[in-house]
Amino acid sequence: LLAQGITRVQQTQGRLKQTLAESSFTAWNKFYKQDENSPNAIVSYYQKGALTALCLDLLIRSKSAGRHSLDSVMRQHYRDWCATRQGIPEKQWQVRCQEITGLNLEDFFQTALYSTRDLPLAECLATAGVVLTWCALPRSHGGGLADAKTDSFPPAPDFGARFKQNGDGATLTHVFNGGSAENAALCPQDKIIDLNGFACTDLALQWSQ
């Protein structure tokens, strides 16, 4: 499940263009109103947010030698709220988190929340004895646990687009930045009716062959 979540975020070019804070702030007019270019322009605040929480928890545990965790931080936040019944400003959560743990976490918050740099997943997971292995896999794979066979065979070529198959061809719905479809100058709403002289009756099958 974790590998699948990491893969979904890494396969989204939007992670390099939209910060986590921006994703959360614009959720109602971008994330919930996606268009044909959304995979290239936005990142899911659900998926990247979950990975950010994981990294923060592991970072706190490592830097505090196990004395604190994200759970203990959230419990203290809840106790604070019970005492005052008041909310907190946007960035006060980060300030309070550092006060509770006694740690300087500014660099992490800046990277995770306000930049488009990738999360330090490998480094954080390593503190818990987990090795993160990156493998070249087709987009349809979805991610998972690596095994001895993962690197034994080259991955199937990735078409680089989503499409809707019809009886007389395949209509592209999304074209991913940097993929084969974009490199071939294909665009959303383009219709493929022929592949190497054969009618495009099953693009997924014909492409894999």
What does each model-found stretch correspond to?
Residues 19, 69, 178-179:
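Secondary-structure junction/capping motif
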Residues 84-209:
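Beta/coil-rich, acidic/histidine-enriched accessory regions frequently appended to metallopeptidases
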Residues 1-14:
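Zinc-dependent metallopeptidase catalytic helix centered on the HExxH motif
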Residues 17-33:
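Active-site-adjacent bridging/hinge elements
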Residues 10, 28-132:
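Amphipathic alpha-helical substructures
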